[in-house]
């Protein structure tokens, strides 16, 4: 995988190649954070507040700690019980947050790569990919957090936010296999602009089906 090769060069490549790899990695991380923290995505998440209130539990997946903290804080200000879950928190702090999510006291969890394989996550019926991972395995794990069969027969709902004409745009081939697997099990799917918040909320309303 290309990213693995870059990381290998930063650790053990020739001096010139290692320098170039480190420069590329810095720019890549900056771009990843910019896509995660773009105000348009923050506004898109805020516009779904009523959908989060109606959901049992919601998982927000992003790629920067600032994004997770901003999302949790913004939703909390809107009266939604939301928490961020990331590596800057201690293990004890993350355990308390997860227990609150399991009990239903916290209904929205914004995560940065801390809910991946090996972490027991309570059942959720809504997930939002605010910023996507380039690792297909990680994306499939995220899908699995929500796509488990619900005891009461409810449909799981899955949202992917993306900036058009960037390398996270599924229409340009981003996460092609992951999106194909998602669509293969979807009852319905659609693409909306951020200006269509009311249409998105109506589409996600479980009472519509």
What kind of region is each of these model predictions?
Residues 50-53, 102-103, 151:
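Residue-level signal for alpha-helix termini/capping positions
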Residues 10-11, 62, 86, 131, ...:
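Short beta-strand/turn micro-motifs composed of small residues
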Residues 57-61, 66-119, 138-140:
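Conserved helicase ATPase core of P-loop NTP-dependent helicases/translocases
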Residues 145-178:
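Conserved segment of the helicase C-terminal RecA-like domain
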Residues 66, 90, 115-116, 132-135, ...:
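Conserved nucleotide-binding/hydrolysis micro-motifs of P-loop NTPases
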Residues 170, 174-177, 184-209:
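Long, largely alpha-helical accessory region at the distal end of helicase-like NTP-driven motors
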Residues 108-111, 116-133, 138-141, 155-161:
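A short beta-strand element within the Helicase C-terminal
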